[in-house]
Amino acid sequence: MIVAEFFENGGEIKGFKINGHAGYDDYGKDIACASVSSAVQMTVNAITDVFGFEADVSAQNNTVFFKTASGDIVLQKLYKAFIMQLELLSQEFNETIKIKFT
């Protein structure tokens, strides 16, 4: 299962950690994992490269960690769009993606 953990502080999303494997299909054929990976890459690139927000980012051993300091409204909307995409993927690929907030 892929676990998407979003970090909240004062009602704002400050980052996320994504880890695990969907187990929807064999490694290299898992479209659920590929879909989540694509959504993560697009979100990270939009936040850092397109909108220019600074972030702490690391990716290793099936885990992506991403954290920002800004509470900018644009950043919050980008996080919300990412959460919405993960929710849609969770509905499409039942029992493969869990979303939680801490």
Predicted segment positions?
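Short, conserved glycine- and acidic-residue-centered signature motifs
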Residues: 32-36
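N-terminal intrinsically disordered, cationic/polar leader segments
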Residues: 1-31, 41, 45-102
